[in-house]
Amino acid sequence: MPNIVLSRIDERLIHGQVGVQWVGFAGANLVLVANDEVAKDQVQQNLMEMVLAEGIAVRFWPLQKVIDNIHRAADRQKILLVCKTPKDFLTLVNGDVPVTRINVGNMHYAEGKQQITKTVSVDDQDIVAFNGLKSAGVECFIQGVPTEQAQDLYKLL
């Protein structure tokens, strides 16, 4: 079973909060970005890699590759798994990726979205995905940085 130390939804994927604060807090030594678009975008990958400290490995995999390969992870790999959307995590969970808790970070406001906290806005598609995660027994909590108090996302929907 893969050693996933933290699963996080963050539209920015890897940035300062994730690359420094969450990696350190979780004790991760591998950041696995599960995103179909970024897996094909070397420029985005290079920018994200610059944020990570020396010694932290990173992989940029499409969702299906994560589903197909996550169970081959070595025990020594302490994985911080990050996706852009709850729909992506629902795809992973439905593909038997062992995710039981998701830290919800940045989901920015846009037309058609409802702001539920200062950093999290959701639309109907997000709510459907979160309800699917809830049905699968996945806990979802909002916490921007490790020093903030976590909030139960489901109570805010």
Predicted segments, located by residue:
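Structural motif
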Residues: 3-7, 29-32, 57-59, 78-81, ...
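A general structural motif
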Residues: 10-14, 62, 122
